[in-house]
Amino acid sequence: MALSHYLRVLLQGIVLAAMMLGVSAPAIAGPQRTEAQAVIVTPLSFFKVDDLIFGRILPSSTAGTVTVAPDGVRTKTGGVTLFNGGGEQPSRFAGRGAANQIVAISLTSTPNRLTRVGGTQTMTLSTFVIGSTPTVVLTGTNQFFRINNTSGIFNFPVGATLAVGPNQVAGNYAGTFVVTLNYQ
């Protein structure tokens, strides 16, 4: 009988331990950090608001192009397939000049390429278009626009075309292009 008493006490202990493990205590989430940013805009300045993103692209054995227009519409030619939900968007810039001021805008004329992160494969960017009325193709030569807002604040999108090679190597591609403004 002593053995059955010990088994009963042991079994009660196991049941009690199981019940205690099943009781949940309030969970306390650890603190999380986030970032805060501000841009102080001075007269005769401008800054990048958004990056140019071409989104997700599936290459094939045939070369093709992907264009993101200044209005955000994405189109393709040739042997590429576009996936939705890739975050595609034109680059956006904003700044401040004076009302009715003329501004010269140009694009650095060096070859503009995206290079595969961790690799050497490239894709070429071309036909940069500023979202104005009418739209203007950006080159190394100055193009001009007028600041129409009475506050002098302006913004504009820039789209471009990406050349995707046949059987382009998969991966993330990144690069830069430089837009220059000269206030007249």
Locate each region found by the language model.
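Hydrophobic alpha-helical transmembrane segments of integral membrane proteins
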Residues: 10-11, 154
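N-terminal secretory signal peptides that target proteins for export/translocation
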Residues: 1-7
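N-terminal small/polar-rich segments of proteins
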Residues: 28-115, 144-184
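Bacterial N-terminal signal peptides
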Residues: 11-22
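Bacterial Sec-dependent signal peptides at the C-terminal "C-region" and cleavage site
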Residues: 22-28
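Terminal beta-strand-rich extracellular "head" domains
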Residues: 104, 113-141
